[in-house]
Amino acid sequence: MRPQDERRLLTDHYDALIAENNDPVLDPPSLAAYMERWDGAPFMELLSLDGTQSVLEPGVGTGRLARRVAPRCRHLTGIDLSPATVARARAHLSGYGNTTLLCGDFMTFPFRETFDRVYASLFLFHIRDKAAALARMASLLAPGGRLVLSVNLERAEWLDMNGRRLPLYPDDPDRTASLLRAAGLVLTDTVPVEAALLLAAGKPQDT
């Protein structure tokens, strides 16, 4: 499948989820707790936010994580392919004056700044070229910045939902760590959680 076809399939799927009112921000407490198997309190601790950082979330979705990050940072930028998803995220984050929500392709969007933190959860399994995605994240980090990833441990190669089928590209923790180093980052933390391995990597100050 061509990359542009994959992007269209992904966009259509997430637009359809919004039309079906499938929105993680609106999950009942039991399902919200289930999602934290990937990015709960240990993930937030690795971000190490004190209110002064600029932060980027590729694959921001409807803002499930962004709503936890925004009160803890100076400014949050989120980007997603799906127009309907971004519109929902804007609604959920409308109470915060320090957020920018963008609709576009993280890999090619012309960001005008670098960020003190970049983080992603349940995102990389949608991307075939992991090396390019991680290099892109590293390039968007300011010197001294930190990248935090939730590396999904599930190995499914397809997502079947509501009559739609999406290809997935499973993550591999060891390869992800190697690719972070290849992108010029220094791996600082590896934290196992229930459904993922959390990785944190820093960008050297002299980069």
Task: For every predicted segment, state its role.
Residues 1-50, 148-170:
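Conserved class I S-adenosyl-L-methionine
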Residues 58:
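Conserved beta-strand/loop positions that form the S-adenosyl-L-methionine
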Residues 62-108:
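Class I SAM-dependent methyltransferase SAM/SAH-binding core
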Residues 119:
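A conserved beta-strand element that flanks and buttresses the S-adenosyl-L-methionine
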Residues 122-123:
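Short catalytic micro-motifs in class I SAM-dependent methyltransferases
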Residues 131-143:
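A short glycine-rich, Lys/Arg-flanked "PGG" loop and its adjoining helix->strand segment in the class I
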Residues 168-184:
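Short alpha-helix
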